[in-house]
Amino acid sequence: MSPAAALTNGSVRQPDLHLVTDDDFVYEQDIQRSPGSTKPWLAYISYKIQHGTVEEQAFVLERACMQLPRSYKLWKMYLTFRTKHIAKLNAAIFAAEYRKVNSLFERALILLNKMPRIWEMYLKFLMKQPLVTLTRRTFDRALRALPITQHNRIWALYRPFANSAAGPTAVKIWRRYMQVHPEDAEDFIELLYQVGYYTEAAKKYIDVLNNPRFTSKHGKGHFELWSEMVELLVEHATEVEAGYETGIDVERIIRSGIERFADQRGKLWVGLATYWIRRGSFERARDVFEEGITTVMTVRDFTLVFDSYAEFEESVIGAMMEVAGQRAEKGVVDEAADFDLDIRMMRFEHLMDRRPFLLNDVLLRQNPNNVNEWEKRVALWGDNHNEVVNTYTNAIAAVQPKKASGPFHQLWANYAKFYERGGDLRSARIIMEKAVKVPFKSVVELADMWIEWAEMELRNDNFEEAVRIMAKAVQAPKRSTVDYFDETLTPQQRVHKSWKLWSFYVDLVESVGTLEDTKKVYERIFELRIATPQTVVNYANLLEEHKYYEESFKIYERGLDLFSYPVAFELWNMYLTKAVDRKISIERLRDLFEQAVEGCPPKFAKIIYLMYGNLEEERGLARHAMRIYERATRAVSDEDRADMFNFYITKSASNFGLPSTRQIYERAIAALPDDEARDMCLKFADMEKRLGEIDRARAIYGHASQFCDPRTTPAFWTKWEQFEVQHGNEDTFKEMLRIKRAVQAKYNTDVNFIASQALARSQQQKQANGHGSGAEDGDDGVVDAMEALERQARAPAGFVAATEGNIKGDAATTNTTVAANPDAIDIDDMED
């Protein structure tokens, strides 16, 4: 064996021949025959792993690596064997054993320094040992030895080692790592933050934010990273080296965010002020707070900045008061410090007094066209004359009439009223004169402005001036073709057609002017075709009050030419009432009523016909009135026709007796729907009964029975039965029953009536249950609709040949009738 082979674990000693047994002879011969081949060594090692001791395995592996030092496979097997052997030993206690393995790795790396797996094994092994410097240097050697394409394998171990080492060592390692992997900058920043390298962390944030290609592996956006940087700068204001040398301008950074991130302005203003507070620059912090509360655009941001400002002032005052208290205890007098405290307290009180104004400023910055907020600002100044005038002046200059939010004309009016209350009517008029020239958003606002001006003159008893102002307001060409709703024209061009303006004008002239002046105004309204029904009524009433009745009637007629129904109905109603009250000639009144009913919709005809008929009854002939009522029954709507027939019948009976109503009843029964015709038949029959015409009444009952289903209208049949009991005989009663069965059979064959029958019976059941114990006998006669139909199908044939009657059902009905009328004749006994 060569001297080199005698090396074991890096030292020279005698060969361990006792580790070679007779069984190893074959393997030793193979090695001698092929000294440069790894195959016999691998076979030898495999045999020893299965049958040899640990010392024998180490002996063979050591010889193999000495014999073939460039064999990666042999070295890996040997190193794995040695590291596994001491894996469970404490690295601090058995440091010597670990150093032996370290020496093996160093020997292996002499020729295998391009093998990343050997480096990884060595580095992992070193990381188990308390050898930070050696481990760091070995990592560096690995990075220098391996090509850059394999550096990731080393960095995967180097980064956890750096984090565990912490401190400056970790920072230096990460700086090198950032050169090849800038995408992990967030982890580096976190490390810098942990070790207190705040300035470098801020610089790294700036580098990241300035790199448009940077993508956060944690999914953070640009704003989130920027916010983290600002938070770092503010929280560690005294530890971050800001200035030209470091390239970190904190105020510029935060102000750029204030301009860029509108929804975060309040938070950023507070952050900037906090930065200066922590650096001890209280005056600069106060300047920042002042700038913040005067520039923020939302109430939320204002509240945030203002509350922080107030808290800052309170803390400063509190600290100064504490120092002042300590001075007082010691008996020390410091007038300058006390004066400074007084100044700060006055400043704080002034700040709190300014809060409503500052808040109002915020709302006006949001929308300078908000009229209501300008009014609130005026109210805040109270009796401060100069500030109120300045506020009104600023408001008028700031508000754009077309974009005004709220009644802009009211702002002008209140401005004028302010001078009016101060007795300066001349200035108020100047304001009003300017106001009516403003291009308001709508004609209504301009009209209100003119009216406000006139009302101001009226309040100061300048009636003629008020009339002159309104005349100027409504001034227009003789034949104006302007469309009131044409938005392309200015309000000043359309205001002369404002009904609100004319209404005020006519009321004003009517109260302070003559009748002729008022008539001219009304006529002008009609010329401009802006009259309303109220205008017509007011004009007519005005003429009537001055005894110009005929002219009043003409006004109604002009109004009727302008308006159609339903407005015309109200005008006709008033016109006809006035005409009748004036007792003009009957012929003229008839002509008016004929005009009124001509083309009148059925919905409105009833009232006019009743008035017409009443006129004929009072001043004409009764026959004429009856003809009018007869026309009314045809002209009115279906809802009013039954009432009209009833009224007609009543009037005919009172004027010409009951017999004269027969034709009316017949027409009503023919014209009305079944439900109303049934009621009309009952009234007709009662009338004939009062006249003693029993047969005619019976015939009417028979006629009405065709649209009276016994199940849904039992009241009709009950009334007919009572009639027959009182005025009939056995034959007539049987005929009534026959008709009843025939009608019931007819309705039973019609599927459309089954549902209505069921509904009627359920209602009867509810009514019977509602009557309590006294209605129990009646409950037996009330049955389910479908059960009744089945019973009818099982019933024997009746005595009416043409139909099949429901005998049992009729018997039940008859029994119910007997229970209700004890005097009725028992037909069943007669038949027996």
UniProtKB/Swiss-Prot annotation:
Subunit structure: Associated with the spliceosome.
Compartment annotation: Nucleus
Family: Belongs to the crooked-neck family.
InterPro entries: HAT, HAT_Syf1-like_N, HAT_Syf1_central, HAT_Syf1_CNRKL1_C, Syf1-like, TPR-like_helical_dom_sf
Alphabetical list of SUPFAM superfamilies matching this protein: TPR-like
Keywords: mRNA processing, mRNA splicing, Nucleus, Repeat, Spliceosome
Swiss-Prot/TrEMBL HAT repeat ranges: 18-50, 52-84, 96-128, 130-164, 196-235, 245-278, 280-315, 383-421, 423-459, 476-508, 513-545, 547-581, 584-618, 656-690, 692-726
Protein name: Pre-mRNA-splicing factor SYF1
Role description: Involved in pre-mRNA splicing and cell cycle progression.
A GO CC term assigned to this protein in UniProt: Prp19 complex
Entries under Gene3D superfamilies matching the protein: Tetratricopeptide repeat domain
UniProt superkingdom: Eukaryota
Principal location listed in the UniProt entry: nucleus
Entries under SMART domains matching the protein: HAT
GO biological process: generation of catalytic spliceosome for first transesterification step
